[in-house]
């Protein structure tokens, strides 16, 4: 018995990094493909720092966060088809929320602000909101990973009652402490973001911004 817990913990701890390695390899291959195409077209001013920042920080973190969410779905269901269904619901849910104008990144799970890059200013000030929301949702992903560890079982046991009993057995002082710290950090970061986006500044949806831009264009057109 004393050897089974370390093996179980090792198996769980190795799964999330292995899953996250898949999008990382894909992005690395995309960067290499970009460089190869540029070289074939006789362009040799390679901006490797920009490529890797755009791929792994701007795009990569989005993929990693969604990977963790899908990983938790597989843990809770232990069924690949139900896990695929959860992924489909997540994608459709984001589309529905956009259509209903619920677009705030504080509650659109793992949806990060867009970043704009220009040759003159680089990413400029657009990267700051991205960094804060990335921190916010990364903390939430850490909470999901802890929950995943609590409900993780090996073998064919799929009953939620068994998973709940296993989770209660693992919910010791270390797990509770880590959960509490991450929840406090998550709430604190969310409050700071809300203060900056909704109190210090005026928050508006995409449609509201488009309408304001159209009105400004009509005004100055005269």
Predicted regions and their residues:
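Helix-loop-helix units of permease transmembrane domains in multi-pass membrane transporters
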Residues: 1-25
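Interfacial transmembrane-helix boundary/kink motif in multi-pass membrane proteins
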Residues: 8-16, 163-174
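Terminal transmembrane helical anchor/hairpin motif
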Residues: 43, 81-166, 189-211, 219
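Membrane-water interface of alpha-helical transmembrane segments
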Residues: 52-55, 124-134, 172-179
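Alpha-helical transmembrane segments and their helix-start/interface "positive-inside/aromatic belt" motifs
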Residues: 75-88, 173-182
């Amino acid at each position: 018995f004393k050897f089974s817990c370390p093996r179980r913990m090792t198996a769980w701890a190795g799964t999330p990094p292995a899953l996250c390695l898949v999008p990382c390899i894909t992005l690395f291959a995309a960067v290499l493909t970009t460089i190869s195409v540029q070289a074939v077209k006789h362009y040799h001013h390679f901006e490797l720092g920009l490529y890797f920042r755009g791929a792994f920080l701007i795009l990569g973190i989005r993929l990693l966060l969604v990977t963790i969410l899908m990983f938790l779905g597989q843990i809770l269901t232990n069924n690949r088809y139900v896990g695929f269904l959860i992924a489909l619901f997540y994608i459709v849910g984001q589309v529905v929320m956009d259509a209903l104008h619920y677009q705030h990144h504080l509650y659109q799970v793992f949806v990060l602000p867009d970043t704009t890059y220009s040759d003159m200013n680089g990413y400029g000030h657009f990267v700051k909101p991205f960094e804060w929301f990335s921190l916010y949702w990364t903390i939430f992903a850490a909470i999901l990973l802890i929950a995943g560890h609590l409900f993780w079982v090996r073998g064919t046991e799929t009953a939620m009652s068994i998973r709940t009993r296993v989770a209660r057995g693992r919910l010791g002082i270390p797990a509770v402490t880590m959960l509490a710290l991450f929840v406090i950090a998550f709430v604190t970061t969310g409050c700071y973001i809300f203060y900056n986006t909704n109190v210090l500044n005026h928050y508006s949806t995409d449609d509201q911004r488009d309408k304001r831009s159209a009105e400004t264009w009509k005004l100055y057109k005269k």
